[in-house]
Amino acid sequence: MKRRTTVALSILVLLVSSATSLAADAADIEFKRTRLDDKFRSEGVAVGDFNSDGRMDVGAGSVYYAAPDWKMMSVLEQPKEFDPHAYSDSFCNFADDVNGDGRTDLIVVGFPGKETLWFEQPASPDGAWKRHVGTPITNNESPSFLDVDGDGRRDLLLGYDPGKHIGFARVGGATPWKLVPVSAENAPGTDRFSHGIGAGDVNGDGRTDVLVTAGWWEAPDSPSKTPWVFHAVNFGEPCAQMYVYDFDGDGDNDVASTSAHMIGIWWHEQTPDGWKTHTIFKDISQTHSLNLVDINGDDLPDLVTGKRYWAHGPTGDVNPDHPAVVYWFELQREGGKPRWIPHRIDDDSGVGTQFEVADVNGDGLLDVVTANKKGAHYFEQVRK
């Protein structure tokens, strides 16, 4: 059976493919940096129209930055600001019309083990945003927003309690959202500070499977048949978002991951005899978030990641004060083998625990947006 390649973990991966139709040589690609904020407000960001004016804005926890001049607007009564020596209460942000009223709302995954909230966009820009609880407990540090069950709506992929399940929350409708278990109780990857979770078609049957560093759950013919069958695999060290794609072009899907608090960017090759881990890059520490997107429009998805600056403060982890870089790694194939060419985007910003790659300004090119302890930044892709 011919294997089907699936790029998963963010709906943006599916939506932005049309935005990268203009192929370009990497030497002709640059990124123009705009600092949206110099305060630490969030380690996640969302791209969406948060004031219904037709432009893409940037959400970051308690605020959003309104395009085109990026004026900061508060979602709460007062915007939050955090000490860079500590942590925020905003680890992942996603944009979605949660209640189906035609307006884009802001989903904020809080500190690990705490609530996921969603803030309802008001009918008028000067109205008050309403706060709702989506999930009372959200475990694992890299929850993701994608369609797990194939119903056309994005779900929140997460670990949750009680029971320590890997599963997904059906976003929308009544709150808290309905939780659907993928795993049995006490599954790996379900502690509040667990690292590494993702989704994609691991076995090539056309269905979206779920994976953590300890293995993957095989999607049944109906997602309601729980628990899913678990396959134990060593997908390496504690990581962040995990992606599934046929990187070497041999017909079966592989996995990409990045080190959350140590050093390493890897691809895990699926072979007839099992899985083999390869190092892509080892010059960046704390690559605590990852995106898989086609930056240069050559129909091969590239990796985008960077350093989570001061992930555990100024003395924690490895090389906490090294430059806060952002990179994209260009996927190329030679003789049936993949290789990744590193291209630096910036060296004084970094990433958080989640970031977005999207066509922010509508020019057909993919841009990068981040938020972390160095503030919030928008990197506009420009072509020479």
Please identify what each model-predicted range represents:
Residues 22-384:
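Beta-propeller-forming repeat regions
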Residues 8-19:
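Bacterial N-terminal signal peptides
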